Curated annotation (Swiss-Prot):
It is found in: Membrane; Golgi apparatus membrane; Cytoplasmic vesicle, Clathrin-coated vesicle membrane; Prevacuolar compartment membrane. Gene3D superfamilies: 3.50.30.30, Laminin (2.10.25.10). One of its GO terms (molecular function) is calcium ion binding. Keywords: Calcium, Cytoplasmic vesicle, Disulfide bond, EGF-like domain, Glycoprotein, Golgi apparatus, Membrane, Protein transport, Repeat, Signal, Transmembrane, Transmembrane helix, Transport. Residues 1-25 form the signal peptide. It comes from the Eukaryota. The gene is VSR6. SMART domains: EGF_CA (SM00179). It comes from Arabidopsis thaliana. A motif (Tyrosine-based internalization motif) lies at residues 604-607. This is Vacuolar-sorting receptor 6. It is a single-pass type I membrane protein. Residues 610-631 are annotated as: Disordered.
Length: 631
């Protein structure tokens, strides 16, 4: 980064700091009361400044015995002993101010087993609020684990308690939070000042976790008419001399009127401050429009869904992603856009203008200078932003005996999937939903139904996956039955996707019958007559011919008998030749044998020289022999 750029950045930072310090100068210290019950001679009531960490016992009180950590024991290190009083009461530990963070003192006190910690001021001054330390790895290890109440007491009161303990007196105190928050009527009004930046580390994570965890409580209170919740977002404005600078342009909308710090504190990388302001404005408009539609509690759904689906960490923090969340929750997008207006216009935005005015405290209400800040009945909440701790504070804001049931029961459950399916995907036809109700709210997660896993984002899509997917609503694919015939675009041979069956065309989600006759894709042979049918076609040939579908041709049905005649003639000719050959063979064989016999006999019977005549017949012997052999 160049020196010029560094200088401009520093100048802008200082200018913004002066603006903030000039506007936000009045911080209200929220208090509890501390009463000395024993010794009776010391009975009196004092104020204590509630710490902005731990868990104040709003609406209640604590009576305990006091112990002192000791001179020079600042509680900056773990105590090597536990503090046990003489009587079976909770222990209230006094620790001197100084040397380390307030929260670390209270943490070490909590580790030693005490029920509450009072930090004794070492300066004679008005009470101040003990705040959490700056974000650091060391502080983050214990700050969220603080579960006990703590407060700062003034220098004079602390010395009074120490002197009594030094004399061996048993000191019993009552710390009372019952009047720490106003409780005028049967409805509690509370506000949460936050922002949409999810890249600011543990503090941003704390805010988002609170919204997710408190959503169930908040929606029950809002739907029942027990509370009136309003979200708020801190913005600054750019000094007039810097409006045209690149820094102001990257951090502000509406010509420098509404600004937020760069989330990465790097003007050349990642998201800009104006992206934060723009989403802050959208979330304000979501609440405004939802409230006009008597659905103000939907703000909690939008914020949690936006964080899940459109986070900066996943590089999805965008207008397009936000609008998809709006539509999934059934909110009128056009009205929200109208509420947002044009962020580039050189005009005031009425919504953000009102936010800047509310940041400045009026009357008994202090300025909003810390994020997050929770305000209950116009008084700032002190303590960690945790579901049960905040619920207890809100419940303490009801007029006595008007508390709703949620304040009287430790268990709470609401089925958020019953309304608009929780903004999740659902298939009404097969009664399958991605909405799962949990104690902390609902989640959108594709289900497993009858052994079939659905896959998708759970918000806009879930599709059955695997070999058995067609058993559930045909895998989400097209399917239709006509005249006893059923066709489907789902195939169990494929683990996903839809494909129209033969005879149909489309994307698988919708399929239409193909008119093979009209498209001339079949039955185009000579003499063929084509008739379209649902899922196929019928082709008939003229005359006595038969249609062959694979070859798209017709053949003669009588052709089989005509074809056999030549074969028969040939076979008959072959048979005749065989018979004739056999007869000729027999004749030739006999003639050959006769000649052979005659030749043999002629050697032994000279027939010509002995040509005698038989007296009985008148024939010669030679003639008789020939007749005999020929017989």
């Amino acid at each position: 980064m160049s020196l010029i750029h560094k200088g401009a950045t520093l100048a802008l930072f200082l200018a913004l700091t002066m603006v903030v310090n000039g506007v936000f100068g009045r911080f209200i210290v929220e208090k509890s009361s501390v009463t000395i019950l024993n010794p009776l001679a010391m009975r009196s009531k004092h104020d204590a400044a509630i710490a902005n960490f731990g868990v104040p016992n709003y609406g209640g009180y604590m009576i305990g015995s006091v112990v002192y950590a000791g001179q020079g024991a600042y509680g900056c290190d773990s105590f090597d002993k536990t503090f046990k009083p003489k009587f079976p009461r909770p222990t209230i530990l006094i620790i001197d101010r100084g040397e380390c963070y307030f929260a670390l003192k209270v943490w070490n006190g909590q580790q030693s087993g005490v029920a509450a910690v009072l930090v004794a001021d070492n300066v004679d001054e008005p009470l101040i609020t003990m705040d959490s330390p700056e974000e650091s790895k060391e502080a983050d290890d214990f700050i969220e684990k603080l579960n006990i109440p703590s407060a700062l007491i003034d220098f004079s009161f602390a010395n009074t308690l120490k002197q009594a303990l030094k004399k061996g007196e048993e000191v019993v105190l009552k710390i009372d939070w019952s009047e720490s928050l106003p409780h005028p009527d049967e409805r509690v009004e509370y506000e949460l000042w936050t922002n949409t930046n999810d890249e600011c580390g543990a503090r941003c994570d704390e805010q988002m976790n609170f919204v997710k965890n408190f959503k169930g409580h908040a929606q029950i209170l809002e739907k029942g008419g027990y509370s009136l919740f309003t979200p708020h977002y801190i913005t600054w404005f750019c000094p007039k001399d810097y409006v045209s600078s690149n820094q102001c342009k990257s951090q502000c909308i509406n010509q420098g009127r509404y600004c937020a710090p760069d989330p990465e504190q790097d003007f050349g990388d990642g998201y800009d401050g104006k992206d934060i302001v723009f989403e802050n404005l959208r979330q304000l408009c979501v609440h405004k429009v939802a409230k006009e539609n008597n659905r103000s509690w939907v703000w909690w759904d939008y914020v949690t869904d936006f964080h899940i689906r459109c986070s900066m960490k996943e590089k999805k923090y965008s207008k397009e992603c936000a609008e998809r969340v709006v539509e999934s929750l059934g909110l009128p997008l056009d009205k929200i856009k109208k509420c947002i207006g044009d962020p580039d216009a050189n005009v005031e935005n009425e919504v953000l203008k009102a936010e800047q005015a509310l940041q400045v405290g009026q009357g008994d209400r202090g300025d909003v200078t810390i994020l997050p800040t929770l305000i209950v009945n116009n008084a700032q909440y002190r303590g960690k932003l945790e579901r049960n701790a905040v619920l207890k504070a809100i419940c303490s804001g009801f007029k006595e005996r008007t508390e709703p049931g949620i304040c009287l029961s430790g268990d709470i459950e609401t089925n958020e999937c019953l309304e608009a399916n929780g903004g999740c995907w659902e298939d009404k036809k097969s009664n399958v939903t991605a909405c799962k109700d949990t104690f902390r709210g609902r989640v959108c997660e594709c289900p497993v139904v009858n052994g079939v896993q659905y896959k998708g984002d759970g918000y806009t899509s879930c599709e059955p996956y695997g070999p058995a997917r067609c058993s559930i609503n045909q895998g989400g694919c097209w399917s239709e039955t006509k005249k006893g015939l059923t066709f489907s675009a789902c195939s169990n041979l494929e683990t996903s996707g839809c494909r129209c069956p033969p005879g149909f065309k489309g994307d698988g989600l919708k399929c239409e019958d193909i008119d093979e006759c009209k498209e001339q894709s079949a039955c185009q042979c000579d003499g063929c007559n084509c008739k379209n049918k649902w899922g196929g076609f019928e082709c008939k040939c003229s005359g006595n011919r038969l249609y062959m579908k694979e070859q798209d041709t017709c053949i003669e049905r009588s052709g089989s008998r005509i074809g056999w005649f030549p074969t028969f003639v040939i076979l008959a000719a072959v048979a005749s030749i065989c018979v004739g050959g056999y007869v000729f063979y027999k004749y030739r064989l006999r003639s050959y044998m006769d000649s052979e016999i005659m030749a043999i006999m002629s050697q032994y019977m000279p027939l010509e020289s002995q040509n005698t005549t038989d007296p009985m017949t008148g024939e010669s012997q030679h003639q008789q022999l020939r007749l005999t052999s020929a017989a």
